Amino acid sequence: MREKAEKPAKRKLTRNQRKQIEAVIRQAKGDGKNHTVQDSIPFQNMFPDGLCRLEGGTFSKTIAFEDVNYRLAGPEDQRSIFESLCDFYNGYDPTIGVQVTLDSRSGGSAADEMFGIIRQGNDLDPIRDEAVDILRMQYKRGNNGYVKTKYVTLTIEAENLPAARARFARIETDTLNRLKVMGAAAHVLDGKERLELLYNILHPEGGQFAFEWDWLPASGLSVKDFISPSSFHFGETRTFRIGRRYGAVSFLQILAPEMHDRILTDFMEADGNIMVTMHIRGINQNEAIKMVKRKITDLDAMKIQEQKRAVRSGYDMDILPSDLSTYGGAAKDLLTDLQSRNERMFNMTFLVLHTAETRQKLEIAVSQAASVAQTYNCLLTRLDFQQEDGLMSSLPLGLNRIKIERSLTTSALAVFVPFVTQEVFMGGDAMYYGLNALSNNMVLLDRKQSRCPNGLVFGTPGSGKSMSCKREITFIMLMTQDNVIICDPEDEYSPLVKRLGGQVIRLSPSSTDYVNPLDINLNYSEEENPLALKSDFVLSFCELIMGSKTGLEAIEKTVIDRAVQMIYQPYFADPRPGNMPILGDLMNALLSQHIPEADRVAQALDLYVNGSLNFFNHRTTVDISNRLVCFDIKGLGKNLKKPGMLIVQDAVWNTVTINRAIGRSTWYFVDEFHLLLKEEQTAAYSAEIWKRFRKWGGIPTGATQNPKDLLSSPEIENILENSDFIYMLNQAAGDRKILAERLNISSEQLAYVTNSEPGHGLLFFNNVILPFADDFPKDTELYKLLTTKPSEVAHETVDDEKEDQNG
């Protein structure tokens, strides 16, 4: 007897999910009358893997691709992108339809959510509110709140679903590889992503897309019910209604003999919701050649007729109508291209979709686009009586119902370059770094998502180095729970640190803020014995104060290491603050060895233990557990500044190791970074930080006006190699040349760091290079805290007054 198969358990929907489904059902039913909105959307099925069945045996898939730095590329790089674009189109045979979609639409009210700044009910809320206002203003001022996306939709014919999937597996791989060659990151949209894209197009007024695949059986709805607008109205000749919005679809008549590669860019820079669609289908090569030969034959026949007419009329038979001569020569050139120059023929339909809140705004947007078309000797013509077909052909489904086509060769087609500039617009803890100088889109990035989040800020004095660091510090404090430590050689950060509730530690012989250079915690090293790394620091410290050009001798290193082992034994036996050793303990441990080399090191330490520079011979008296700590080392004299910077670095390492244990990131900002690179010991320690911090959740940033110092030795050069974030402001001529060679900067890109305004420059992040402009609003409290211009700095006390000489 066969057992009954056990029915799978029904998935219980949450209350919120039931509400969302009921809302969709209400929208689908409307007022009880028959509605055909769903029937208008021209596809039959959407599958979870992103495969879509259109009409009959037609299937499509959509790939989203990112922008490429085309505008700022040099002539050779632009030529390379153009040739790659030619190869991209030539790679599709006539059985594959290609639809390129460029979409620009309002980001809506979701903009505030991107900034991630939420009121906390404390003293920083006024700054949070102002920061959100500034970001909102920059967002609207930059790209007017429009988000630009790019897609390519591929269409094939197949007998069934498995056959379609098998063929798309190869086509997808080839497409992704071709886009990668051009430098465009791309990914295949799954079914839910395609539905969300369609939802956003069909709901130009905005809204939240709500859909899960397992809702379909429970609700009895189809996927179209989740993406359909409330209504379509195609009763007018030249416009249509979609929900409460007005729309219009136009087609581009290409009249110019040659096109410019900026036409798509200019269309997409227009205000308003706009979507440009290019439907492209290759023509069989043999058919294309036959077609051109027929044209040549027809032109030759016309030429013969004109010559006969000339003989009968008694004038020179070589005098022909100019159009006939022109077309005849062009047709022969085209035949040569098709037969010997790797050119193919394509049919293209060019559609432009506009949507707007009112009819008046719609007409303004369409007229702006028409002006762009006229600039390039083209006509943008409304699709009279074909608005529904135009809208459905604009959807990224791969279906073209508009049979107004223009035949183009591969080169003529590739002139429609869909690239402008790369964008950095990330989610998560992404922070504001300015506006893209080419697209005016906001630059939002999260350095923690980078392979190597270490950073460098380059700029001449007055270019905005310190202000950019302060802006980043402010947003870290407002948006994350991370720790921030600042090494401040010029006392420029104190007002900001105080306002953000941080702690300023003033290191100077007259200060009572003490930091013990021998502080250690049990997590100080990833090895079992934390003394190994601490001993390395003590060796660097002793080498620095002894001032030996040849470094420590082997015996000196041995006696120092032995002393380090001795002085930490009481602390590790009983780890309480009172047992933490100080420099005096180290000197005594050296003297107790009764070895000349140990005595020599002890004598060098004496100045820092019993002499006038005994500032560091104390246990730590300040609490560096505050989220924001600034080490002000301006008051350290010439003899104390070098060891002081080394000690600050070690204190930073201590904090990083403590935070790693609790899963918290630690940001470390070093202003006037070149001061650390001048001394061998601090430079070596800096290189070690840049090499090791990433594993421990540390994110160092060095700001300097002398980038050439980073190339002074192979060891220091690693700092540049290990920095995936570079914020480059105005550069001196010599530094520009060095950086251009080292970072492969084109002359077009270099113009953005040549005599540039404060806050303007180039941003390097991972593999992206983009020009930015950060014009921070001056009539704000934040600006007064960030600026370092002497005429604009507001200080609370006389001690806080200072001049900014280094940007």
What are these regions (language model features)?
Residues 465:
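Conserved lysine of the Walker
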Residues 743-798:
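Conserved P-loop NTPase
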Residues 68, 75-94, 101, 105, ...:
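P-loop NTPase motor domains
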